[in-house]
Amino acid sequence: MKANSTKLSQLMKSVEIPFIKTEVPEIKVGDTIQLGLMVKEGSKTREQLCEGVVLARRRKKSLNTSLTLRCSFQGIGVERVFFLNSPRITFVKVIRRAKIRRAKLYYLRDLLGKAGRLKQIFN
């Protein structure tokens, strides 16, 4: 049974490889990123910019790699989950990095104003 599952996982990886984007920069939890998202409105498509802090990241080297981004939209905090290898994402740009000590930053949901800021790392 185990031999079949390893063959199946190898087959799945070989199928996924052509669809994985290679030009995505290294993104860590705590980074402030900006990404372009293609949005279809009726018959038109436009690029929508989304900028925010990465709260969580799942499956680092897979086709299903996703990240949770917390943006502020008209003064209200909004969390969105993006699949990095989605064809709707046009670009990803790291704006600033932060020093963190947690794997997931879900505690930022409850903090407002200055309390919700992260300590910036200067390279």
From Swiss-Prot:
GO terms for molecular function: structural constituent of ribosome. The keyword Ribonucleoprotein applies. It comes from the Eukaryota. GO terms for cellular component: chloroplast; mitochondrial large ribosomal subunit. Belongs to the bacterial ribosomal protein bL19 family. PANTHER family: LARGE RIBOSOMAL SUBUNIT PROTEIN BL19M, RIBOSOMAL PROTEIN L19. This is Large ribosomal subunit protein bL19c.
